[in-house]
Swiss-Prot record:
Taxonomic source organism: Gracilaria tenuistipitata var. liui (Red alga)
Top-level taxon of the source organism: Eukaryota
Region described as Disordered: 1-20
Gene3D superfamilies per the UniProt record, alphabetical: Ribosomal protein S20
Chief site of localization: plastid
Family as reported in the entry's similarity comment: Belongs to the bacterial ribosomal protein bS20 family.
GO cellular component: a single term: small ribosomal subunit
Localization per record: Plastid, Chloroplast
Annotated Polar residues bias: 1-15
Record GO terms (molecular function): small ribosomal subunit rRNA binding; structural constituent of ribosome
Protein name in the entry: Small ribosomal subunit protein bS20c
Reported function: Binds directly to 16S ribosomal RNA.
Amino acid sequence: MSKNVSAIKKNQVSLRNKRKNKSYKSAIKTLIKKYINSLDELMDLNNTYVCTLKLSAVYKKIDQAVRKGVLHKNQGSRKKSMLAKAMKISISRIKTI
């Protein structure tokens, strides 16, 4: 370990940021999994309003992560696009039944 004070502080800051970033990413992954799992249940009830509310909550968390620099803006866009596509597919599946 370094004895230089600035190097020690820099290491502490990087570890702190790593923990924060990991918790943000974990929260996003958890919300995405919950949303994907709830899509089938909500579409069985034909409740698109609740689906859009849950989708907006996930979008909000992704946008916050992009704003804070945890995710790159392109990665955030890809995640949001994937979620919208999943919702669209599940809605079309319900309409065909």
